[in-house]
Amino acid sequence: MAEEEEVEEGRSSSSAILDLPEPLLLHILSFLTDVRSRHRAALACGRMRAAERATRSELSLRGDPRSPGFLFLSHAFRFPALEHLDLSLVSPWGHPLLSSVPPCGGGGGGAPSASSSSGMNVYHPEAISEQNAFIAARLAGCFPAVTSLAVYCRDPTTLANLTPHWQASLRRVKLVRWHQRPPTLPDGADLEPLLETCAALRELDLSEFYCWTEDVVRALTTHPSATAALTHLDLGLAAATDGFKSSELGPIAASCPNLRKLVAPCLFNPRFSDCVGDDALLSLATSCPRLTVLRLSEPFEAAANIQREEAAITVAGLVAFFAALPALEDFTMDLQHNVLEAAPAMEALARRCPRIKFLTLGSFQGLCKASWLHLDGVAVCGGLESLYMKNCQDLTDASLAAIGRGCRRLAKFGIHGCDLVTSAGIRRLAFTLRPTLKEVTVLHCRLLHTAECLTALSPIRDRIESLEINCVWNTTEQPCSVANGTTTECDPEDDELGEVYESAAKKCRYMEFDDLGSWEMLRSLSLWFSAGQLLSPLISAGLDSCPVLEEISIKVEGDCRTCPRPAPRTIFGLSDLAGFPVLAKMKLDLSEAVGYALTAPTGQMDLSLWERFYLHGIESLQTLYELDYWPPQDKDVHHRSLTLPAVGLIQRCVGLRKLFIHGTTHEHFMTFFLSIPNLRDMQLREDYYPAPENDLMFTEMRAESWLRFEVQLNSRQIDD
């Protein structure tokens, strides 16, 4: 009887919302944006499930849409209002969604799609073609109103089958490919099906799509009617090492006269005769006068090869360039070569582009000299809300003071590689911009150690929401115990600044008396470490109280082979992050930490021991909900795989619900993760270039192995 009474009470409590008219119920449900909240509502009853499907506007598929479980769903499985569909993360990740390549060749990837969709191997090209058409039609039937599509494309077959079903509505497309471009593919063939079919296309995103610059130029110039309608074009090109030349940038701009957003890597190296210079920039501005967002960057060059020569861009050329773009709001020019005496160009930017709000500059010298009381250079851009300056060697504390006086609306500020800036300049800027500044980035500035930087940010400690810094510990200011990976209180007798503090409350010398408050609004924290450095000193350096910190990103770079072997019982220090009470998301990126994947020489540690060093203590993060992990690599053998110590440590994170490994691993290692009680969403992503081409040769994890693990994962009973 008691159970029946509880059921009746539950029905009466839910009847209030279920008795609402259908339009009002749909309107209420449309306000639920959190995915899990919508899922909970959909599980309540059939009417709520139908309402959730009717109002869902975006969806990212993680499973295998080629499997019988999806292909033979009831026709009631339909999302009539869904506009954004992401197919770039379908399982197994990186394998062709639709492919005409027989699975028996060395191209890899065909076997999983054929076997997973029909339960038997289909080798005949006609059978594969029919299968592709059926899968594409099933997707179009489930999601009839798609206007924005993201998809992983190993070859043009996927687009050739999908785009005809949404050709009238498709306005935005993002292509993803981290594998090598098929060498026999004609130039521009990857984009051919898209530009030929989708007349309504307005936005094209290739920021994570590896291809050649020749492909882009050929595709855009041979379809003038389609490209003339484009308003947003992102040509970031995943892992691009070469940018667009002057002879390529001009035709692209001429083919897309209505662009409002353009992102492109360019060749600015003056040693090349076809580099982008003043004439190319002016031609770009003349061809696309409506640009509001323009982001041009020079692909990263190795330090051994780079020489800080002058770029082929002059101040006079920039002045003419800005004069031709009056609507510009967001401008990025991140160069590896110097532009000298850039202050007049920045003043022209403020004068000619009055709407400018977001500005990112790399290797621009003389941005703000601040030699007199009047403002000069970038400081006259009073409408800026975001400013990021990189490798500006003559930027000083006085420059920051002038920027603080002139740019009073700044909410985001960042410097990278500015070696003359000190903590005094950062503190003065923070004090001046206290009412507006919310996000700060300080990276690789020679005179700014981490503790000094945190101290300098004390004026906005209670207001800042996002912080990105590189961790450089001043060993002369650390106790020996901190340098060895442990933390203890400082000895008051060792503090040379005793006259500043009260003797009963002395702190470490990098802690100021007015820095005892908490980081009340800090929600996102990004940390950069060189290989072998410790996280442990971070807490005692000033980041001890972050009550609302939700997300942390840790990036480690360097050659572990040159690092001394850590002392016994010395660990990186992830357990220190357990003091953040609501930490839910972590990105731990060791992809640029290089070591020995196989047997290491005497006295050195292989990658498995380095993974143990960095991951030890991660089980202490009881609130951790989502983890993205990039394993370290051995570039000599192109090895980026999860080792047994890493698997054993990660599987002890009992609170994890989402786990994404950006690398490979062995199938029997995956069974460890089944012991994580609430793990619901997991994926192996080889989203780095070049991703392994052939599962049978270069990766430990086969597609069939992953699908078997996925069945085990999805068959578990999740408590919540």
From Swiss-Prot:
It is found in: Nucleus. LRR repeats lie at residues 71-134, 135-158, 159-189, 190-218, 219-247, 248-279, 280-316, 317-344, 345-372, 373-398, 399-435, 436-452, 453-510, 511-537, 538-571, 572-606, 607-644, 645-720. Its main location: nucleus. Expressed in leaves. Expressed in roots, culms, leaf blades, leaf sheaths, shoot bases and panicles. It comes from the Eukaryota. Residues 14-60 form the F-box domain. InterPro entries: F-box-like_dom_sf, F-box_dom, Leu-rich_rpt_Cys-con_subtyp, LRR_dom_sf. GO terms for cellular component: nucleus; SCF ubiquitin ligase complex. The keyword Nucleus applies. Transmembrane segments: none annotated. It holds the Pfam family F-box-like. Keywords: Leucine-rich repeat, Nucleus, Repeat, Ubl conjugation pathway. Disruption phenotype: Increased number of tillers and reduced plant height. One of its GO terms (biological process) is shoot system morphogenesis. Associates to a SCF (SKP1-CUL1-F-box protein) E3 ubiquitin-protein ligase complex. Interacts with D14 in a strigolactone-dependent manner. Interacts with SKP1, SKP5 and SKP20. Involved in strigolactone (SL) signaling. Required for responses to SLs and the establishment of arbuscular mycorrhiza symbiosis in rice. Strigolactone-dependent association of D3 with D14 and D53 (a repressor of SL signaling) triggers D53 ubiquitination and degradation. Controls tillering by suppressing axillary bud activity. Tiller is a specialized grain-bearing branch that is formed on the unelongated basal internode and grows independently of the mother stem (culm) by means of its own adventitious roots. This is F-box/LRR-repeat MAX2 homolog.
